[in-house]
Design a protein with these regions (language model features):
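Mid-domain beta-loop-alpha active-site segment that forms a flexible
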Residues: 202-222
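Glycine-rich phosphate-binding loop and adjoining beta1-alpha1-beta2 segment
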Residues: 39-80
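A structured beta-alpha segment of the ubiquitous adenosine-cofactor-binding alpha/beta core
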Residues: 68-117, 125-128
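Glycine-rich adenosine-cofactor-binding loop
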Residues: 10-29, 44
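E1/E1-like adenylate-forming module used to activate ubiquitin-like modifiers
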Residues: 113-209
Length: 232
């Protein structure tokens, strides 16, 4: 399906770890090369731990630092872009709705016409409770592009949902895999240290593959104005 290539862009990414850490540097570069206003907001409440260094996009100097802040400051500074990040988990609907609210821009100084941002929500938190929250936000949005990625050690999926004029044009992850909406998952902040330690680690290959699928969709939406809506 077609997407506009002349509107300002806002990308909001939930999760700056396994997948988000590899998505971030290339989204920053992609937005930097656009000839229109673009913003990138990275959100994550987690900190960099030693166990993250082998499979996530961090280095020893990042240990103990907030993941969203590390990624946002590192790449926005290098590219001369505004640094925007939220150093906490997004777990409440009003907070998410505020993040994905499109800003209006005056692109022509000689005209009073204002243009709304095209908003992309990237779900890089492999957690079904967060997907349920994003599903709610998606269906309450007048317009939104919601790309969700999820992967295990060897398999995964990336699904792009589209809302336009208050209608669902393409189903999001919750519509494609409705079983995820029934899962009794916990938000990241609700998971204890013991439970987190027992989680099966994802492989770096799966993380990079999922990130690449997300980036292909984002690139095609913003530059080619067309994309396939699922990747497995």
């Amino acid at each position: 399906m077609k997407f506009p290539t002349d509107r300002p862009v806002k990308v909001v990414m939930l999760g700056a770890g396994g997948t988000g850490g590899y998505v971030a540097p290339y989204v920053f570069r992609l937005l930097h090369m656009l000839d229109r206003p673009a913003r990138f907001v990275v959100c994550d409440g987690d900190i960099v731990e030693p166990k993250n260094l082998d499979r996530q996009n961090f280095v020893p100097a990042d240990l103990g630092e907030n993941k969203a802040r590390v990624l946002a400051e590192r790449y926005s500074t290098v590219l001369g872009m505004e640094t925007e990040y939220v150093p906490s988990f997004i777990e409440k609907l009003p907070d998410l709705m505020e993040l994905i609210e499109p800003k209006e821009w005056e692109l022509n100084p000689y005209s009073t016409k204002r243009t709304k941002e095209m908003v992309l929500l990237l779900g890089c938190v492999d957690n079904n409770k967060t997907r349920q929250l994003c599903h709610q936000a998606f269906h309450q949005s007048e317009e939104l592009i919601y790309i969700d990625s999820g992967n295990g050690k060897y398999t995964g999926q990336v699904v792009c949902g589209v809302r336009r004029n208050g209608r669902t044009i393409r189903k999001s992850i919750g519509g494609v895999h409705p079983e995820m909406l029934k899962d009794t998952d916990l938000f990241p902040s609700e998971i204890s240290c013991a439970e987190a330690a027992q989680e099966d680690p994802q492989s770096i290959v799966a993380n990079v593959t999922a990130a690449t699928a997300v980036l292909i969709m984002v690139y095609n939406i913003l530059t080619v104005s067309y994309t396939h809506l699922r990747a497995h």
